[in-house]
A protein has these predicted regions:
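Extracellular/periplasmic periplasmic-binding protein-like sensory domains
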Residues: 218-226, 273-357
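C-terminal motif of bacterial Sec signal peptides marking the signal peptidase cleavage site
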Residues: 15-19
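Extracytoplasmic "Venus flytrap"
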Residues: 53-85, 89, 96-112, 127-133
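Hinge/cleft segment of the Venus flytrap/periplasmic-binding protein
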Residues: 316-430
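Periplasmic-binding protein-like
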Residues: 66-69, 120-131, 149-154, 195-197, ...
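Hydrophobic alpha-helical segments within soluble ligand-binding/sensing domains
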Residues: 59, 169-195, 246, 313-324, ...
Length: 430
């Protein structure tokens, strides 16, 4: 796999560093960022190049952009990213909507929530993040009614070829590369066992089933034990409270069973906070969340008030890192320095704006990268186009992306994962 936009991002990072007076500290050490989300976005406006860079100075014209996310309880970062984009361009230009928490049982409501945005005659783009079941059908209905509306899917829960057939653009976390890199990082930190926590609905998704297959294969390469654990689905009858209670109750037994050198991973956002809370208490490793962010589970697990740091991911990361060090958990917990969900919601909307303004092509990966960097100005990203493991067909509108992993400690450090060459065999593991 080629790092198709590594040179662009190197240039982005160079400009971002120059804007900080040449400071080469990690995000957790650099306290120079603004606590205002808008300021972070303005800093990112300097990060692009060529037409993409120029477009970042442009506002939203006589049209509207809609963003659909989950609720704060299900996917807070996704929602906060949408709110940041709306705050930047105005409520009169950006419409936000929330699909039901129990989206699997309320499929028609989910579809209608997305489709309703097309009732606005000035609507020109609809972004859904995460693209839960029903998004594909909603996009098809929108295209039938309003073919002029750009449809962008972030983090698809449906099969990527399927949602790619209805969406103009799909961006997903790189489940293949990350499946390998998470195991590799756990091994480098000293873990001897990897515990994967999920439930049948998630394991039916191609993205998650392929990732877990890659993880299991990578454990063989690094001589680690691989374990599957099942936890309740938060969209089932037990709801989020019941699912979280299960994690809280079972982690101590898992730590006793697998030892303190086991690394854990869960596929659901709602499981993350209780998992982190108990691992900090009882011992273990956590490389990064399913959708990584310093906000994903850490504030609640550590009892942090991040009101003053809101919108400034460098300060958020520093506070989370400091709390972990104080609790004796240094070098055991990681994340992406900038929230994936936050960046994806806001960045894909930024890209849609650039496409509507006529300065970017919808499937130009360099332009997508520049838009993402508006909300993650110092991030090192990598990725590749999606290839169907069964058919071998490569999609021209589905992209897989990931950010370098940051392990929190004293000092913390980036693992250099964005520069690691993934062994070719893992791209056909399924």
């Amino acid at each position: 796999m080629k790092k198709f936009f590594s040179m662009l991002l190197a240039f982005v990072m160079l400009l971002a560093l120059a804007g900080c007076g040449g400071d080469n500290s990690t995000p957790a050490q650099d306290q120079g960022g603004s606590s205002d989300a808008g300021q972070t976005q303005q800093d990112g406006n300097e990060a692009g190049s060529g037409d993409a860079a120029a477009s970042l100075e442009d506002g939203i014209g006589d049209y509207h952009i809609g963003i659909v996310t989950g609720s704060v309880s299900q996917s807070e970062d996704d929602r906060r990213g949408a709110e940041a984009f709306q705050a930047k361009y105005g409520e009169d230009k950006v419409t936000l909507a929330i699909y039901p928490d129990n989206f699997t049982e309320e499929l028609e409501t989910t579809i209608q929530t997305i489709v309703n945005l097309s009732d606005d005659p000035q609507m020109k783009a609809v972004i859904v993040n995460q693209s839960v079941p029903g998004t594909t059908e909603a996009f098809r209905q929108i295209k039938e009614r309003r073919p002029d509306i750009i449809c962008i899917a972030g983090e698809g829960h449906e099969d990527l070829p399927e949602i790619g057939s209805a969406a103009d653009l799909v961006c997903n976390n790189d489940f293949v590369s990350r499946g390998y890199l998470i195991i590799r990082t756990a091994h480098e930190l000293g873990a001897d066992t990897f515990v994967h926590i999920s439930f049948p609905r998630h394991m039916a998704y191609e993205t998650m089933s392929r990732r877990v297959a890659v993880m299991e294969e990578a454990c063989k390469e690094f001589n680690m034990e691989f374990v599957l654990e099942t936890a309740p689905d938060p969209t089932s009858d037990v709801g989020i409270p019941g699912a979280q209670a299960y994690i809280l109750e079972n982690v101590p037994a898992w730590v006793q069973k697998y030892g303190e050198n086991a690394a854990y991973f869960c596929t659901n956002d709602a499981h993350t906070e209780p998992l982190l809370k108990q691992l900090v208490e009882y011992g273990g490793y956590f490389i990064e969340a399913d959708l990584p962010s310093p906000l994903m589970g850490y504030p609640g697990a550590l009892g942090l008030d991040l009101t003053e740091e809101a919108g400034d991911f460098e300060k958020i990361l520093a506070k989370v890192e400091s709390a972990l060090v104080e609790k004796g958990a240094a070098d055991h917990f990681g994340t992406w320095a900038y929230s994936y969900g936050y960046t994806l919601s806001a960045g894909l909307a930024e890209h849609a704006k650039n496409v509507i303004n006529g300065v970017s092509d919808i499937t130009d990966m360099d332009a997508v990268a520049a838009a993402l960097n508006v909300y993650s100005p110092k991030a090192q990203w990598n990725g590749a186009g999606y290839t169907n493991a069964t058919t071998g067909v490569k999609s021209d509108n589905v992209f897989l992306i990931y950010q370098d992993t940051y392990i929190m400690g004293n000092p913390g450090r980036f693992m250099g994962n964005a520069d690691v060459e993934i062994p070719e065999k893992y791209f056909t593991v399924s």
